[in-house]
Amino acid sequence: MELEDIVNEEMPTTEDVNDMLEHTDKGRTKQTIRNCVTVLQKDPVLKKAIKRNELSGRMDIVKEVPWERRNNSSTVTDTDENNLKMYLEENYELTSERVIKAGVDIVSNENKYHPIRDYLESLVWDGIPRIENMLPHFLGAEKSKYTIGVMKMHMLAAISRIYEPGIKYDIMLCLVGSQGAGKSTFFKYLAIKEEWFSDNLDHLDDENIYRKLQNHWIIEMGEMKATITAKNIEQIKSFLSRQKETYKVPYEVHPEDRPRQCVFCGTSNDLNFLPLDRTGNRRFAPVMTDMSKAEVHILDNEAESKAYIEQAWAEAMVLYRQGNVFLGFTKEIEEEAKRLQKEFMPEDTNAGIIQEFLDDYDDDYVCTRILFDEALHRTGEMKQWEGKEIANIMNNAIVGWKPHGTHRFGKEYGIQRSWKRMKDSVKKDKDGFIEVPEQLEIPFE
């Protein structure tokens, strides 16, 4: 077979495609989904032109079409739909909107693609390690097992969310430091393309939150606004732990589960940016930046910065393909994560007041009512939320006491749930000195 014959066979004309369609006895094109699918699969202009974007969930036009498009975006617009209908009407007598809609849905799904997956698979690593140096290089962060570990974890999580949408990952990488260090730019460049990045997440209870996640890979919470405006810490935990959103996009009939394909990042100039959580802020991975120690500012040479980050993604892809991907704090870095999580929380004044009270407290049993009255010096009836707050402090922030069950506290307080002083806890006498047991060995002569 000659080359010209092969080309002609692969690229049929509109007349050839018309001959493939089912017609009525009068020679008119039947308004069937099968006919529409055939046209979309075989027409020289429309073949592989419309694909379903697995990142956005929308349909994209990915090749040149015989009408003027409204903007530079690949996403199908109303104007595209109207031009497609006119093209099908003029060339194939297909006019049924129901048929055209169904045909486009079927064929675009057959031709689905993932732009980020395609990008990642196109990368070739040059063999030079960069992930371990990214945070020190651009942001002056300390190079340590912790900073290397959280950067690698976050990049592998971002890749995992593309290949395994909805995979469990509930940690937010947070960059802390002075304004102008390039923290937000770092995350924007990390997303590779501007359309894969978003910093438009200000409220976690936004009813249209899915629209702000859709089509984005790296999502920054600038100045941690979304966590600041959250109703409570549980709302933040729930949001970060969620693996999917369930919603119905416009023009679709049925709602669908949309597994998350994004990871979340935070930036802040405030050193006390984390919410007060006495159970621990394990969902946050804070990294302190220092612009004065950075090897380069990320904006000094945009092309070089982007090339560096692209090679870091190529390196991360090599690690991902090797397997053994762990999307959490390893034992090696967990202690440092806990220390930093506490360091970036606001001071817990009530916990400090209660701890000081208990250090001088005579009894070995205590309850929330005693702490409410005598430690915090509050008056009136203790509200339910106040009792919960005190219990939370006792269970998570106080040293030397443990939950005990019920205990009788006399006429004033009656039987209450209690905490008991632990045996190895020390108690001060009335003058503020620690009692030393007789058998304790004095460490000097």
Predicted regions and their residues:
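AAA+/SF3 P-loop NTPase mechanochemical coupling elements
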Residues: I209-Q214, V249-T267
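Conserved AAA+/SF3 P-loop NTPase catalytic/coupling segment centered on the Walker-B
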Residues: I218-L240, L274-G280
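N-terminal nucleic-acid engagement/recognition segments and initiation subdomains in replication
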Residues: M1-R130, K145, G149, G380-W385, ...
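A short helix-turn-beta junction within AAA+ P-loop NTPase domains corresponding to the substrate/partner-engaging
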Residues: L276-E295
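DNA transaction DNA-binding modules
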Residues: L327-E445
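P-loop NTPase catalytic core of nucleic-acid-dependent motor ATPases
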Residues: V104-Q214, R369
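Short glycine-/polar-rich loops that comprise or flank the Walker A/P-loop
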Residues: N215-W217, Q243, R260-V263, T279-A285
